[in-house]
Amino acid sequence: RDYYASRGLGDVYKRQMRWNTMTLEFESRPCNESFARVSAAAFLAQLNPTVEEVADVKTAISEAVTNAMIHGYRQEKGKIQMKCVLDLEEKVFQVTVKDTGVGIENVEKAMEPMFTTCPELERSGMGFSFMEAFMDELEVRSHPGWGTEVVMKRKIGVHPEM
């Protein structure tokens, strides 16, 4: 008989083993964007993703972290928090990128392709569009003066090869 089940812990243990989380906090420096991407990719490896799935997730994270640096903190120093959650049973990867920067006044407008708050920096305004394209779900929560939280999900192993 199972060790955990014999102690009445079978279901509790299974539920606990279903999830794995990782949280990173780093400064809003350009060099940390690649650190965030690579850290998330290494964590995602537990789900045995394809090369394409890893590339998609890394691209979406890169866009979210860059948005926090450029738009959230207006290139000033600040903290970015990235939390990754794996549902090992359903093979779902979720990442939350959060800043405490200036926030977004109109999220709906900000998510329109080609919209940017920094045209002088030659920003393309495609960050949210890329996040939507590479992930299955995207949710953006923001409030001016409080910062922005970007939550993205991707099911691993269900997307056809290109």
Predicted regions and their residues:
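Single conserved hydrophobic/aromatic residue that forms the stacking wall/gate
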Residues: R1-Q16
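Short linear Ser/Thr-Pro motifs
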Residues: S6, S28, S62, T116-T117, ...
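Conserved beta-strand-loop-beta-strand hairpin that lines the nucleotide-binding pocket
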Residues: K14-T23, A68-M162
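STAS-typified acidic loop motif
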Residues: T23-F35
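Conserved short strand/loop->alpha-helix "switch" segment adjacent to the catalytic nucleotide/phosphoryl-transfer site
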Residues: R37-S62
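Conserved polar catalytic motif of the HATPase_c/GHKL fold
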Residues: E63-N67
